[in-house]
């Protein structure tokens, strides 16, 4: 009989419960939300993005999630999901948090030096996305220094953000997409 070429085989596979349960962390019965980590999101004018991040972080295992915003942005967060803490930004609010997510829904009205200060001073794991990535546009050297300084840093640029920061040739980007 003829065999199906590998290129034609499905790239989607059924994920079964047995496999899922093997990858999930095991917790004892005495664990509480305070033991599972606290994610802080710096929110902005587009509240939906920050709210999704806060909600999703709890869904994947964080015990607590907080969205910190400027006082004039609090009005965008009046009807947040139960379980999401909304607070006015202060440096003190960043203490004892495990993960910082900065960028989703931030908007362009934040002071760039203020955002950089938050990133540089935060001691935990950091995810930089969207508008916080755009702060480093045309600052390739600065982003490289940040990557070297912060060992637990994840950048999530889309293609346009990546091009604005790193200025790769179009051929290199196409090669990466083809390789993936």
Per-range role (PLM):
Residues 1-127, 134-180:
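Small-residue (G/A/S/T)-rich helix-start motifs and N-terminal tracts that mark the onset
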């Amino acid at each position: 009989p003829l065999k199906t070429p590998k290129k034609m085989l499905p790239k989607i596979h059924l994920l079964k419960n047995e496999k899922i349960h093997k990858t999930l962390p095991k917790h004892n019965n005495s664990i509480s939300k305070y033991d599972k980590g606290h994610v802080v999101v710096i929110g902005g004018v587009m509240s939906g993005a920050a709210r999704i991040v806060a909600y999703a972080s709890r869904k994947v295992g964080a015990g607590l999630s907080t969205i910190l915003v400027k006082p004039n942005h609090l009005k965008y967060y009046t009807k947040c999901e139960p379980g999401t803490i909304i607070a006015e930004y202060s440096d003190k609010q960043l203490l004892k948090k495990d993960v910082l997510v900065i960028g989703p829904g931030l908007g362009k009205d934040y002071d760039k030096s203020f955002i950089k200060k938050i990133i540089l001073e935060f001691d935990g794991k950091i995810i930089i996305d969207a508008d916080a990535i755009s702060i480093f546009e045309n600052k390739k050297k600065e982003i490289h220094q940040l990557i070297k300084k912060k060992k637990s840093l994840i950048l999530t640029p889309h293609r346009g953000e990546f091009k604005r920061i790193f200025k790769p040739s179009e051929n290199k980007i196409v090669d990466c997409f083809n390789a993936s």
